[in-house]
Curated annotation (Swiss-Prot):
GO terms for molecular function: ribosome binding; rRNA binding; translation initiation factor activity. PANTHER family: TRANSLATION INITIATION FACTOR IF-1, CHLOROPLASTIC. The gene is infA. This is Translation initiation factor IF-1. Keywords: Cytoplasm, Initiation factor, Phosphoprotein, Protein biosynthesis, RNA-binding, rRNA-binding. Component of the 30S ribosomal translation pre-initiation complex which assembles on the 30S ribosome in the order IF-2 and IF-3, IF-1 and N-formylmethionyl-tRNA(fMet); mRNA recruitment can occur at any time during PIC assembly. Residues 1-72 form the S1-like domain. The modification Phosphotyrosine is found at residue 60. CDD domains: S1_IF1. It holds the Pfam family eIF-1a. It comes from Geobacillus kaustophilus (strain HTA426). Disulfide bonds: none annotated.
Length: 72
């Protein structure tokens, strides 16, 4: 899958789960399970419930995603 095929949406973290997983509510009302991208993990950026984030979704599985950016 090419990187161009991802769907980028914004959402809010509602719950922190084990193993750096998060439950994120998207702007359209859907809830997805998201993990942290490598760059965020590498730079020790903390993500807490209530944070606004950008999530990349694969067109093949819209229930899982990757958090690529945390807004300040």
């Amino acid at each position: 899958m090419a990187k161009d095929d991802v769907i980028e949406v914004e959402g809010t973290v509602i719950e922190t789960l084990p193993n750096a997983m998060f439950r994120v509510e998207l702007e359209n009302g859907h809830t997805v399970l998201a993990h942290v991208s490598g760059k965020i993990r590498m730079h020790f950026i903390r993500i807490l419930p209530g944070d606004r984030v950008t999530v990349e979704l694969s067109p093949y599985d819209l229930t899982r995603g990757r958090i690529t950016y945390r807004y300040k």
